[in-house]
């Protein structure tokens, strides 16, 4: 979770850094611009950019008080427009709030390379979630979803109100260490 601005610099000495496909997840044009500026010295652009809107599951790149003021369509349009203006050929993949095939097609028709759909597949047999958890997703309606601040990263999280993660205790913010926790939950 979070925009790790130094991630490409951390990896650039790895022998496969130039060969593997690397993508980033952003929630705004500003976040993309910051990342590209910070990673410019590595001489490598991301191979794709996932643009997550406020309806994405899990961590959100917005403030707890203003996440609902943003929308995926606007953010995606801004990112696509800026990339065209800068003549940067980086595929854009919108995510968060894409519910139907019609939604997906509308993003593809406006220049997105693909779309990311995740929550819809949590109820699929192949997902690997326990059947009890899948049933909770299947039964959930809009009123069963909340955005809260329980994440150790400090970012708001969108999740089911009945999630076992709620009330499980806050883990330390490990941002300075790359969000790595040991088996005891310590940075």
Language model segments and positions:
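Active-site entrance/lid segments in N-terminal catalytic domains of soluble metabolic enzymes
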Residues: 1-86
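Generic beta-sheet signal
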Residues: 25, 52, 95, 117-118
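Conserved active-site-proximal phosphate/metal-binding subdomains
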Residues: 46, 56-72, 76, 80-91, ...
């Amino acid at each position: 979770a979070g925009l790790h601005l130094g991630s490409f610099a951390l990896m650039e000495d790895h022998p496969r850094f130039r060969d593997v496909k690397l993508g980033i997840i952003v929630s705004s044009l500003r976040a993309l611009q910051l990342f590209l500026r910070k990673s410019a010295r590595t001489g490598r652009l991301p191979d794709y950019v996932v643009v997550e809107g406020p309806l994405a599951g899990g961590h959100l790149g917005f403030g707890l008080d203003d996440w609902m003021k943003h929308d995926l369509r606007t953010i995606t349009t801004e990112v696509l427009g800026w990339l065209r203006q800068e003549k940067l050929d980086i595929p854009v993949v919108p995510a968060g709030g894409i519910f139907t095939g019609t939604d997906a097609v509308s993003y593809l028709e406006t220049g997105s390379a693909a779309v990311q759909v995740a929550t819809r597949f949590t109820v699929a047999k192949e997902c690997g979630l326990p059947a009890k958890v899948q049933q909770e997703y299947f039964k959930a309606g809009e009123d069963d979803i909340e955005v809260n601040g329980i994440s150790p990263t400090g970012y708001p999280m969108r999740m089911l109100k009945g999630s076992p993660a709620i009330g499980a205790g806050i883990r330390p913010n490990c941002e300075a260490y790359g969000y790595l926790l040991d088996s005891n939950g310590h940075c």
